[in-house]
Every structure is written in C-alpha cells, then in structure tokens.
C-alpha cells in the first residue's frame, strides 16, 4: 500500500509541474514582449532574459503504522495509519541576452526563408509584411522606387499598404506562391576533357547529354534560387525568364524577398515587380512601440485594381494595444510597467487579428533563438 501511494503521487506531481513550468515560461516571455514594446514607446533600452534551464527535484516519503482503534475492545482492534510527505526543490537558470547573442537575435534582419516558413503556416501575408518589412522597393525601369512602412511618411506608407493588400487579396484566392526560383545551370565541355571515371562522377550531380556532331557534353544542374512571391507557378517559367529574375537577384540581400505579379494571372490588373526588405526583431518592437504614440497606423483603402479582400479585413494598426491604470479585465495577458498596464486588445472586430499578431510576434522571437548556455543538469529529475 505504501509503494502504491508513492507511485500514484509521483506521476501526478510530474504532470502538474511540467504544465506549471511551461505556463510560467510562456507567460514570462509574453510579458517581456509587452514590456519591451512599452520600453520602445518610451525610448528606453530593450532587453530580454531567457530561461536556459529548469530543474525540479521531487521527494516523496511514505510511512505506515498502527494504533489501537478508538472505541475498540481494549486494544483488541488495530487501526492502520498511512501518511506521507512531499517536497519540491526547483532550480531555474536564467540568462540575459547580451553581447554577440543580442546582435544576432535582435539586431540582425530576418532572412527571407523565415518569412516563407510563416507563409506556409497560412499566416496572412498582409500581417506578415506589415510587421516584418521595413520597406518595399518597386521596380520602375531602370531603378527602384522605395516606399517605407512608416505612418509618419504618408505617401510612402499608403503605397506600402496598398502593395501588401494586393498580395493579400491574391492569397485569399489561393493564387499566391512563395517558392524558390528554380534555376538550371548549363555548361558545355569537350568530350576529350572527360575520362571514364570523371564521367561517372558527373552523372551523379548533373544531367549529361552528348552531342556527336560537335563531340561535346552538355551538363545541366537544377538548383534552388532566391525565394520569389508570385501570382503564378515559378516552375512554368522559361529558362530565359528564370535567368532574368536570377540576374536581378544578384543585387538582393538575404533579408530581401522579391515578388513578381504578372498581368496574365489572378491579380494581374496591377502588375508589379519589386523587393521587400525585412526588419530585425529590435526594429519590429520599435515599430510596434511607436504605433502607441504619434506614429500610429491609419486606414488605407486598397487600390482600385486590387481584387476583393476576404471579409474586407484591413485593420488600421498592425497590432493594437490597450494602456490603462487598472488591470484590463478582458485581456488574455497584461503586464504592469511604470504604473501602467499594457495588453493586446482582444475585444472588438479585430480581436482575432490582434491575437494572431501577438502570436506572430511570439513566434518571431522564438525564431531568433540561438543556443542558450545551459547548466549541466537534466530538465526534470524525480527522486523517490
């Protein structure tokens, strides 16, 4: 019976501990995100502290005994006694994000593959680009026109918003692609330059074709080029079109993501070609913080050439926050900083949008995670 008692208690304690620690870590990070948006609004330094390790040691002790039963026959009746004690000793290691880790996680712009990964999770491209992109560069031959994602610059901001609304409308109709540009590299070499062993090695990496007239081999290799947002399947492009887009990509940075909207496909009433330049996480927090004050977003109508947008979803703000002197009663999570409570607004017509925006912010922070130094202990140990 004693062993059974200890065996039943330990799994229950473990389950509760795992869930409790998971909730605590998630809430702590969520509150840090809100606090740092508030810090950005007040032009205070942004700082994060990460939980690198949680170790919890559980001790279970059970005992048993017997005593005369009250009211018994002068001790002739014995009553068993069972008891036990439970002790928990948690150890939590926290590490401030600083130095080179701060530079890599918070100051380095997001690479294009991070945005593509989120697009494949079916996040709204409008939400993604409004939060992650600092500007759009529209190609107007022979140069680019730059439109910044800053509400303070009215003309730039409104063009930026119209471009991302156009992409969102294409996505709503399931006609938006975000795929690596398929490239084919071709080389022609004399047949006499290849020996038998070399020929076998080439066949492992290239498709090889022999031309008996010129006695040459043509080598072809398929590679994945830069990621491209389009309203058509990039695999259908001709070799010449792929080469043209690849030549343009030579001027792009790893934090740039290009788009090519063509006239003969859905959304083609407004053909455009250009590049979005992505922000760093530090810049995203600054953008959201400024939106609390004078740099708040505002309503921008879609372009007349843009197809209908699903449910006419077009919030003024990328993520709306509530600020109050008392704890907000309907907020999912809030944090107190400098005698004010900050929370994501989860009421009204854009409650879902705001929740999605905060979830996206949480994911973006997780996507910056590097290896956090860990103490050499297991996550949870159980001792009985």
Which residues are covered by each model-predicted region?
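N-terminal amphipathic/basic membrane-interacting segments and domains
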Residues: 9-384
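C-terminal motif of bacterial Sec signal peptides marking the signal peptidase cleavage site
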Residues: 4-7
């Amino acid at each position: 019976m004693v062993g059974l008692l200890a065996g039943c208690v330990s799994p229950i304690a473990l389950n509760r501990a795992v869930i409790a620690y998971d909730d605590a870590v998630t809430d702590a990070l969520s509150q840090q995100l809100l606090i740092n948006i508030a810090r950005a609004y007040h032009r205070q330094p942004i700082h994060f502290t990460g939980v690198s390790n949680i170790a919890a040691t559980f001790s279970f002790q059970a005992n048993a005994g017997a005593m005369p039963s009250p009211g018994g026959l002068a001790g002739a009746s014995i009553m068993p006694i069972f008891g036990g004690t439970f002790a928990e000793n948690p150890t939590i290691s926290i590490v401030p994000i600083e130095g080179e880790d701060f530079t890599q996680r918070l100051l380095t712009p997001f690479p294009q593959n991070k945005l593509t990964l989120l697009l494949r999770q079916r996040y709204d491209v409008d939400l993604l680009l409004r939060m992650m992109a600092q500007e759009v560069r529209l190609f107007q031959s022979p140069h680019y026109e730059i439109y910044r994602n800053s509400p303070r610059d009215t003309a730039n901001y409104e063009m930026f918003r119209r471009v991302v609304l156009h992409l969102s409308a294409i996505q709503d109709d399931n006609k938006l692609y975000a795929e690596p540009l398929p490239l084919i590299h071709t080389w022609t070499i004399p047949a006499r330059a290849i020996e038998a062993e070399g020929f076998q090695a080439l066949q492992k990496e290239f498709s090889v074709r022999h031309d008996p007239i010129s006695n040459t081999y043509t080598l072809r290799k398929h590679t994945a080029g830069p990621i491209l947002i389009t309203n058509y399947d990039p695999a259908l492009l001709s070799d010449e079109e792929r080469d043209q887009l690849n030549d343009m990509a030579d001027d792009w940075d790893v934090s740039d993501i290009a788009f090519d909207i063509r006239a003969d496909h859905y959304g083609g009433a407004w053909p455009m070609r250009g590049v979005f330049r992505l922000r760093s996480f530090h810049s995203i927090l600054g953008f959201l913080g400024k939106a609390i004050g004078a740099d708040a977003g505002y309503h921008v109508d879609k372009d007349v050439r843009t197809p209908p947008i699903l449910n006419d979803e077009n919030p003024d703000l990328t993520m709306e926050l509530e600020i109050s002197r008392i704890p907000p009663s309907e907020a999912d999570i809030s944090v107190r900083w400098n005698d004010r409570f900050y929370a994501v607004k989860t009421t009204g017509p854009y409650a879902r949008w705001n929740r999605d925006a905060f979830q996206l912010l949480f994911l973006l922070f997780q996507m910056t995670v590097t290896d956090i130094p860990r103490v050499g202990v297991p996550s949870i140990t159980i001792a009985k």
